[in-house]
From Swiss-Prot:
Organism whose genome encodes this protein: Streptococcus pyogenes serotype M28 (strain MGAS6180)
Binding annotation for L-methionine: 57, 100, 250, 281
GO CC, alphabetical: cytoplasm
Binding site for K(+): 44
Lineage of the organism: Bacteria, Bacillati, Bacillota, Bacilli, Lactobacillales
PANTHER family the record matches: S-ADENOSYLMETHIONINE SYNTHETASE (PTHR11964)
Family designation: Belongs to the AdoMet synthase family.
Cofactor list: Mg(2+); K(+)
Principal location listed in the UniProt entry: cytoplasm
Biological-process GO terms, alphabetical: one-carbon metabolic process; S-adenosylmethionine biosynthetic process
Protein's UniProt name: S-adenosylmethionine synthase
CDD domains (alphabetical): S-AdoMet_synt (cd18079)
Assembly with partners or alone: Homotetramer; dimer of dimers.
């Protein structure tokens, strides 16, 4: 009997409470960076019925209207009706942002290497904190992402498209998806075993109508027919009713969907969240760099699966460790890949910022539907412009 395995990942829509918080935090970050690219920002958001609290630490010359940024973001998501219990114009906005700690700033603004005499400009900025970050890529999908999280993101994005276009008029902003994929004995995806979709709706919509629309207009529009069969299970709004949703149903907080933001649990995670943080925070920038490395390694044919770990000490520019794990799929020893990575990629925070051009206001668009593997927007860490350099570096190391 051949061994089959199941793996499940989930995603949530832009109207999920935690994702509302992420988008507000990143909208504030973008607004600040648009005026002050050198700003240091750590903006956290909490949302609940009728209220938004924004708090954290910033260092900037910019002035932004936080109240307006918050309301515009909520309106763009789709919370514009008072009956939702959370609407753009009636919500209470409570900002409480303070100056970044001087003790932290001194290590970020002048790294240990710079203080010890390194005159390289890219050694001037130190890591904003200690920590470990992971990046991953696998050849299961064209975007080199695991199939379960890729499909989960596509499902909730499709729901949002149908809601915003008015094609399914009874949909409301909050939604979740979950996809279970069956793998064969060679770890290749062969079918979708289970799809779970919970979507908020107007009270007049019937369960039968929702089920039919979701299966025909969402699931079958997203998941290739080859992956669906008579044994595929569909759970559509399995509680039977989802009228109360968004912050009226659950509070939301920045940084609570870190697995949705990355690889759906298929790869390890260092624990740091992304949204609301400028690129001196290696939780964010080094995670993007690690994805960039992993994706280019796989695209170069040096492995079919690659996980990259980076780790940093606060106030120090150079990473304390770089590890490449290919799970036995690499064409050369992993030590060779690690040496090649160090040759090709400058992994100091300033090097990452320069390499990926991370001082721009590009972050709000990443705050829903995943930071990795995006095909609908142009993100620098998704580009495959280091493939040739990696191949050549491997040759020099060998």
């Amino acid at each position: 009997m051949s061994e089959r395995k199941l793996f499940t990942s989930e995603s949530v829509s832009e109207g999920h409470p935690d994702k509302i918080a992420d988008q507000i935090s990143d909208a504030i970050l973008d607004a600040i960076l648009a005026e002050d690219p050198e700003a240091h920002v750590a903006a956290e958001t909490c949302v609940y019925t009728g209220s938004v609290h924004v708090f954290g630490e910033i260092s900037t010359k910019a002035y932004i209207d936080i109240n307006r940024v918050v309301r515009d973001t909520i309106a763009e998501i789709g919370y514009t009706e008072a009956e939702y219990g959370f609407s753009a114009e009636s919500v209470g906005v409570h900002p409480s942002l303070v100056e970044q700690s001087g003790d932290i700033a001194q290590g970020v603004n002048e790294a240990l290497e710079s203080r010890e005499g390194d005159t390289d400009d890219l050694s001037h900025i130190g890591a904003g904190d200690q920590g470990l970050m992971f990046g991953f890529a696998i050849n299961e999908t064209p975007e080199l992402m695991p199939l379960p999280i890729s499909l989960s993101h596509q499902l909730v994005r499709r729901l949002a498209e149908l809601r915003k276009s008015g094609e399914i008029s009874y949909l409301r902003p909050d939604a979740k998806s979950q996809v279970t994929v069956e793998y064969d004995e060679h770890d290749k995806p062969v079918r979708v075993d289970t799809v779970v979709i919970s979507t908020q709706h107007d009270p007049e919509a019937t369960n039968d109508q929702i089920r039919q629309d979701v299966i025909e207009k969402v699931i079958k529009a997203v998941i290739p027919a080859d992956y669906l069969d008579d044994d595929t299970k569909f759970f559509i709004n399995p509680t039977g009713r989802f009228v109360i949703g968004g912050p009226q149903g659950d509070s939301g907080l920045t940084g609570r969907k870190i697995i949705v933001d990355t690889y759906g649990g298929y790869s390890r995670h260092g624990g740091g969240a992304f949204s609301g943080k400028d690129a001196t925070k290696v939780d964010r920038s080094a995670s993007y760099a690690a994805r960039y490395i992993a994706k280019n390694l796989v695209a170069a044919g040096l492995a079919t699966k690659a996980e990259v770990q980076l780790a940093y000490a606060i106030g120090v520019a150079q990473p304390v460790s770089v590890r490449v794990d290919t799970f036995g799929t690499s064409t050369v020893p992993e030590a060779v890949l690690e040496a090649a990575v160090r040759q090709v990629f400058d992994l100091r925070p300033a090097g990452i910022i320069q390499m990926l051009d991370l001082k721009r206001p590009i972050y709000k668009q990443t705050a829903a539907y995943g930071h990795m593997g995006r095909t609908d927007i142009d993100l620098p860490w998704e580009r495959l412009n280091k493939v040739d350099a990696l191949v050549e570096a491997v040759k020099t190391v060998l």
